């Protein structure tokens, strides 16, 4: 069964490469991609706690992690996809990763003023206190947001973002309405040095930013009164002068009781400030 699934993964990867190769024939189109297959074979080594029983009750004698991804661009348009296979996941990776399929795909249009992306999105607001989606293949982590993102740049130095969608949770269906939450967020950032002509060449640098994110998830807990809409907001300031830099950010989130925090109804807060100095060959950062 594993061999057949692996063959299906390799065949699907080959078909993707062939199909995207045809698109690359279009003049001015660019295509790039990569693939990787990691494997482990396990042998009994009681010195590090690997026994016949642990192999039998664990993932088995071997583990395989594989992926292939393709990105295509033509003018203002870009698109891509990633196909993954865990047959089964290697030791140290979550067993819920086991499976084969198209894990990620997206299509995006950006003309400099407005950008629209449909599909799986990776982004963050500020330092990522209240919204951050990213993928780290070596750790088996991926919390991409499948939905829509719009970025609008009405004038020089001003960037507005809006996102909407559902986050990836292993191979769980995005269509599930009760078990999957919907994430909605907006973010704005104003770079004063770009917006104000008198500050274009100034040694003093300043930017302001703010975000709001809400999560909706139906309450299916028969015991606790869980809020279905949970909101969080964030504000940040970045300042600099010459070789010095200062940044501060504050985030607040209303109560979000769940099994992960033992159903506490306390609100959450986060604060980060940093002072930095840098020159050629030397740099220092102080953070609180």
Question: What is each residue range found by the language model?
Answer:
Residues 1-31:
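Bacterial Sec-dependent N-terminal signal peptides
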Residues 66-68:
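N-terminal, Lys/Arg-enriched amphipathic/low-complexity engagement segments
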Residues 122-129, 133, 288:
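Surface-exposed extracellular loop regions of Gram-negative outer-membrane beta-barrel proteins
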Residues 26-30, 36, 40-63, 73, ...:
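Signature for the C-terminal beta-barrel architecture of outer-membrane proteins
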């Amino acid at each position: 069964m594993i061999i057949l699934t692996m063959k299906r993964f390799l065949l699907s990867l080959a078909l993707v490469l062939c199909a995207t190769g045809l698109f690359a024939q279009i003049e001015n189109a660019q295509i790039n991609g990569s693939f990787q297959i990691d494997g482990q074979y396990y042998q009994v080594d009681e010195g590090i706690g690997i026994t016949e029983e642990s192999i039998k009750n664990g993932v088995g004698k071997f583990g395989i992690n594989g992926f292939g991804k393709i990105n295509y661009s033509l003018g203002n348009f870009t698109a891509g996809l990633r196909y993954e296979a865990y047959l089964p996941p290697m030791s140290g990776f979550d067993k819920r990763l086991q499976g084969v399929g198209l894990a990620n795909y997206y299509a995006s249009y950006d003309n400099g003023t407005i950008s629209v992306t449909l599909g799986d999105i990776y982004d963050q607001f500020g330092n990522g206190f209240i919204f951050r989606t990213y993928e780290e293949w070596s750790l088996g982590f991926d919390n991409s947001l499948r939905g829509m993102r719009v970025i609008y740049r009405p004038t020089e130095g001003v960037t507005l973002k809006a996102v909407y969608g559902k986050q990836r949770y292993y191979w769980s269906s995005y269509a599930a309405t009760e078990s999957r939450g919907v994430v909605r967020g907006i973010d704005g950032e104003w770079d004063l040095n770009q917006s104000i002509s008198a500050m274009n060449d100034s040694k003093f640098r300043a930017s302001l930013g703010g975000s709001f994110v809400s999560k909706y998830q139906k309450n299916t807990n028969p015991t606790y009164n869980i809020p279905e809409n949970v909101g969080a907001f964030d504000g940040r300031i970045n300042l600099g002068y010459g070789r010095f830099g200062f940044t501060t950010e504050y985030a607040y989130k209303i109560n979000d009781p769940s099994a992960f925090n033992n159903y506490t109804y306390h609100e959450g807060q986060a604060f980060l400030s940093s002072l930095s100095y840098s020159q050629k060959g030397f740099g220092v950062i102080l953070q609180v």
